[in-house]
């Protein structure tokens, strides 16, 4: 279901599950396993996640819903999805979602779990679960609220109407919108810029930003001071400062 292509320190993870790249349980399981492998691979510093075919992902596999008979089973399905979305968001290496076609329901929940989002201008992004008489279950209510604010999040969920990629940028849901034919190249360019930085520094910033969700400002500021001290004495920091003084491009090794 997933294929991997590597370009330098960037791993391009493509989902291929036609026709709509639905997020079946087997897809989420494989995604988790792929992330485990990337975490241990020093040659992977940044990951791009995108969908093959017409869509990024049109959502959860509705056929799996028909096998659910109890409230407890449904809640367990939601918790399993939430766990993988949290794993994506807490992943120590940057994950960029490259979104074309549609990111709907679980597809948008997955995209929102990624750290950055590049979208095709004409892509459709939404949480249409209420159209089925249900609600988002993979933490979509919370992440959409975080990105676009209460009023827009409620509007999108209550109406089930998606927004375009261009609108997603305007609402803070995506970083950049480009013509679809430029999507993957734009994501690669961004990924390569990040991959050129010290992976130690990149991961430290990601850790601090993630901790801000659950800790106080002063706790995070203290953690920032601690990590500043740890990063400052690394070989990468010495290389970066030396390269600046010598007016050359630094070569970071992640040490």
Predicted regions and their residues:
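Crotonase-fold acyl-CoA enzyme core
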Residues: 87-200, 230-234, 239-242, 248
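Extreme N-terminal starter segment of soluble prokaryotic enzymes
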Residues: 1-3, 10
């Amino acid at each position: 279901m997933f294929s991997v292509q590597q370009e330098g320190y960037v791993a391009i993870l493509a989902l291929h599950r036609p026709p709509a790249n639905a997020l079946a349980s087997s897809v989420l399981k494989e995604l988790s396993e792929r992330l485990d492998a990337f975490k241990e691979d020093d040659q992977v510093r940044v990951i791009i996640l995108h969908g093959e075919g017409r869509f990024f992902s049109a959502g959860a596999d509705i056929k799996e819903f028909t096998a659910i008979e109890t409230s407890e089973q449904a809640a367990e399905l939601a918790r399993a999805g939430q766990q993988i979305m949290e794993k994506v968001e807490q992943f120590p290496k940057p994950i960029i979602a490259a979104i074309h076609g549609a990111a709907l329901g679980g597809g948008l929940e997955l995209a929102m779990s990624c750290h950055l989002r590049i979208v095709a201008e004409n892509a459709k992004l939404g949480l249409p679960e209420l159209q089925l008489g249900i609600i988002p279950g993979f933490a979509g209510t919370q992440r959409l609220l975080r990105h676009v604010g209460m009023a827009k999040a409620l509007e999108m969920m209550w109406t089930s109407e998606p927004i375009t990629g261009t609108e997603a940028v305007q609402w803070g849901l995506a970083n950049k919108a480009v013509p679809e034919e430029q999507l993957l190249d734009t994501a690669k360019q961004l990924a390569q810029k990040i991959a050129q930085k010290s992976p130690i520094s990149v991961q430290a910033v990601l850790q601090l930003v993630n901790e801000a969700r659950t800790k106080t400002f002063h706790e995070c500021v203290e953690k920032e001071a601690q990590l500043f001290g740890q990063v400052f004495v690394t070989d990468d920091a010495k290389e970066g400062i030396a390269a600046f003084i010598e007016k050359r491009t630094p070569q970071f090794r992640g040490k």
